Amino acid sequence: MQPADKDLPLMDDIRLLGRILGDVIREQEGPRVYALVEQVRKLSVSFRRDADQEADRALKKLLESLSTGQTVGVIRAFTYFSHLANLAEDRHRIRRRAVHERAGDTQEGSIELALARLRAAGIAPQTIAQTLAGSHVAPVLTAHPTEVQRKSILDAERSIAQLLAERDDIQARARLYDGANDALTPRALAANEALLRARVTQLWQTRLLRYSKLTVADEIENALSYYEATFLREIPEIYAALENALGQHPVHSFLRMGQWIGGDRDGNPNATAQTLQYALGRQAEVALRHYLTEVHYLGGELSLSTRLVQVSAPMQALALRSPDRNEHRQDEPYRLALTGIYARLAATLKALTGGEAARHAVAPQNAYASAQEFLADLRVIEDSLTAHHGAALAAGRLHPLIRAVQVFGFHLATVDLRQSSDKHELVVAELLATARVQERYADLPEAGKRALLIRLLNDARPLRVVGARYSAHAQGELAIFETARALRERFGAEAIRHYIISHTETMSDLLEVLLLHKEVGLMSGTLDDAAARNQLIVVPLFETIADLRNAAPIMREFYALPGVAALVQRSGGEQDIMLGYSDSNKDGGIFTSNWELYRAEIALVQLFDELAASHGIQLRMFHGRGGTVGRGGGPSYQAILAQPPGTVRGQIRLTEQGEVIASKYANPEIGRRNLEILVAATLEATLLQPTKPAPKTFLAAAGQLSQASMAAYRALVYETPGFTEYFFNATPIREIAELNIGSRPAARKASQKIEDLRAIPWGFSWGQCRLTLPGWYGFGAAVAAFVNLQGKTPGAQLALLQRMYRQWPFFRTLLSNMDMVLAKSDLALAGRYSELVSDARLRKKVFAAIEAEWHSTADALSRITGDQQRLAHNSALARSIKHRFAYIDPLHHLQVELVRRWRAGQDDERVQTGIHISINGIAAGLRNTG
C-alpha cells in the first residue's frame, strides 16, 4: 500500500468532520460567517501548501480588517476544527494498529514485540514473570495550570470518537457484501452522520472556556473521567494479554495508577486536608461503583444450577451466607453469592463515601473491611468455577474484575502528597519556637539544623504544646499529615504512599518531613528505635541544575545517618527519588537539563548499589515529565529506553500532565496503547538494555556540550538585559495567567521574574508563539563550540557526535525530540509575536539572537543526523504537522491582533474571549501544552 493510500481514510474523516462543521457554522451563524471562514481557510491553505506569498499577504490583510465579533467567530471555527482533526487522527492511529495486527506485524512499543524480543534473546517466560513480580510501573496523573480542556468538551469529543469507530465498523461490514445491492450501508452511514452532526452542533453550542476558576474538586472530577473511560477496563485487559502470552506463569499486579490531584500542595493554597479527603472519597466511589456494576452483570451470567454442576464447599458456604431468599434461586449458588457480595459492596460504598448503590441490595449486610476481603470472595467463585470446568465463564468478566480489585483496591489510585521544603521549614520552626526548643530555627546553619533534627527524631516526646495557638499555615500542614494517616486506615495503605518534597536542596529538608511524620504518628517510634517504622515513603524532588548535581551527595549523607537505612528497610525497603525535568530546563536549558538528569540517575544507582551490601532498599526513579519536550515530554517508549543502563530495573513512575492526559487516555484504545508502551519499554530496559555505561568519550563530549549549551541558554534568558520584558510582551503569558484553566497560580510568587514563573506556563507560552524555545535553545551554540574546540579537528569532533547519535540512545532520543520541536516551530509566526514588544531595539536584539540560534540548532541537527529535512524518520507526524499548520496559522495571526488590542486598552469582553479561545485552539492544534 502506498503511503498516500493508507492515509486516505484519515483524509476522508477530516473532510467529513470539516464538512459537518461547515454546515453547522452556516446553520448556526449564517452564510456570511461561513463564507468568511472558508475564505480564511483557502488563503491559509494556499500559502502553507503552495508557498503562495500573495495568499499570505491577502490573509494578513483580511484578518486585520475583521471586527471583534467576526474575529471571535473565525477563531471558534478553526479551534473546533483542530479538536475534530485530533479525533480523526486518533481514530486513524487505532485503524492503522488494527491493520498491523491483522497482518501479523507488531508495532514498536507493543507488548507483543517486547515479548518477541525477549524470547529471541533467550529469556524464558518464567524469568519475565519473575521480573514483573518485582516491578512497579505507575503513570501518575497531575493537574496543571495549562490544562485547557473542559470536561463537557471532552465528553462530547468522546461521543464523536465513538461514532467514528462505529462508522469504521459499518464500512467494514459493507465490504463483505455486494455494494450494488447493499441498501443497509447507506442508511447506516446516514444515521451515523446525523448523530455526528448532533454532536458537532453540541460542541458549537458548548462553552470552550470556563467563566469561573477551576477548583481542585473540578480537577479531581476531570481526572476520574479517565478511569471510567479507560483505566478500569483497559488495565485488566493488558494483564490478560500478558498472562496469555506467558502461559501458565501468573503476572503480579505491577502496573498501577498514581494521582497528585487533591494531594499536591506545592504552590497551591487551594489543596487542603479537605480536598485530600474529597479526592479519596470520590476515587473510592468510582472504584466501588465499577465493582457493583460488574458484580451485578456477573450475577446475570452465572446462572449455574447445582442440579447440573457441583460447586466447591467454600462456594456453597459463600452462597449460604447470602441474604437472598428468593426461592427461584436456591439451586443457583453463584447468583446467591453474588447477591450477597453486591449487598456487602453497597454497604462498603455507604460506609466509605456515603453514597447509595444504583440498584438496592436485597438486604442490609456488613461492609467489607478491606479490598482483600472482597477479593477473597471473588477467588472463591473463581476456584469453584475452575473445579467444575467453568473456567471459560470466569474469563469474560470475573477475571478482569479480580484484576481490577488487585490493581485499584477501594482507593482507585495512590494519591501522592507534595509540598515545598520551605513550607515544612516554617512549620518546624513554629513548633520548635512554641515548645521553646529552638528560637529562630530557620537561621541555624545546615549543620545545626541536622544536629537538632536528629536529636528530636530520637526523642519520643511530641513537640506540640497543649493549648497553644498555632498559625493557620502550621495547622493546615499538620492537618494534611493527620488526614493522610486517617485515610490510610480507612481506604488501605495503598491509598497514600508517597510524600514528595519539592525543592529538596539539603538533607535537613528530608529530616524535617520525618520529624513532622513522627509528630502526627505517621512515623512510629524514634529513629534509634529498632522497631520504628514510617508509613510513607519520603521522596526528595531534585529540580534545579544545582539540586540535580547534589542529589546523590544529599542521599548519601541521609543514608549515612544512624537509623535511617534501617528505618527505610523496616518500612518496606523502597526509596523513590523524583527528578524534575521542568525547572531544570528553565534553569539550564534543554541539553544541560537532560544531561544532569542522566548523571544524577547514574550517581544515585551507584549509591544504592553500594547500600545493597548492608540494606536491600529498592530505588525507584520518579520522572517529573511534562507535555512539551522542554519539560521532559516526547515519546515515552524512547524516553524509557534512553535511561542510563541499570536505572530502570522494573521500577518507574512518571507524571502525565496537562493536555497529555487527554491525548493519551481519553480514547480507551489509544489509552491501552500508551499503557502498553510503558510496560513494553520497562521490560526491554530491564531485561535487554546493555549494562555497560556509555563510552567515556561520549560522556566527556556530553559534558562539554552541556557546559556550552547552558552558557548560551543563560546568556539569553538570565543575562540579556530586557529579556524578561521581551518574554512578557512577545508571548501571551499574561493572557494565559488570566485563563480559568487550573486551580493553582501560574507563578509561585507575584513577580515579573523568570525564576518565579512556573515552568509549565513558561513552556506553554513559548509554544503559543511557535518558538518552542525551551525544547532546543543552546544546542546549536554548544555544537559549534564543540566542533571548533581549540586543539581539536572539526571533522573528528563532528564524527564523534555522529557516532554518539548512532550508538547512544540517550543522545539519539534527545536529538529526535529537538527535531520534532523545531518542526513544530515557525520563525515567521514568532516574528509576528515579537512585534508586540514596543521597544524596537529590544525586540530586534532578542529576536535576532533567537533566530540565529534556531538556524544554528537546525544546522547542527542536520550535520549530526544526516537528515536535511525535519522529521525525516517520522513521516506520519511530518504529514500531520504539514496538514495542521494551515488551520493553526489563522489562530496565531488573530491571537496577535487581539492581544495587541487587549493590551492597548480595548476592554471589549469579546477580545479577551477570542484570545482565550485561540489559546485553546493552538494548544489543540500543536497537541502538547504544559
Swiss-Prot record:
Cite the GO molecular-function annotations of the record: magnesium ion binding; phosphoenolpyruvate carboxylase activity
Which cofactor is essential here? Mg(2+)
Q: What is its EC number?
A: 4.1.1.31
The entry's active site is: 144, 586
Has the keyword Lyase been applied to this entry?
yes
Gene Ontology CC: cytosol
Q: Which InterPro entries match?
A: PEP_COase, PEP_COase_bac/pln-type, PEP_COase_Lys_AS, PEPCASE_His_AS, Pyrv/PenolPyrv_kinase-like_dom
Broad class of enzyme this protein falls into: lyase
Key words of the record: Carbon dioxide fixation, Lyase, Magnesium
The reply to whether tRNA processing figures as a keyword in the UniProt entry is: no
NCBIfam families attached to this UniProt entry: PRK00009.1
Name this protein carries in UniProt = Phosphoenolpyruvate carboxylase
UniProt source species = Verminephrobacter eiseniae (strain EF01-2)
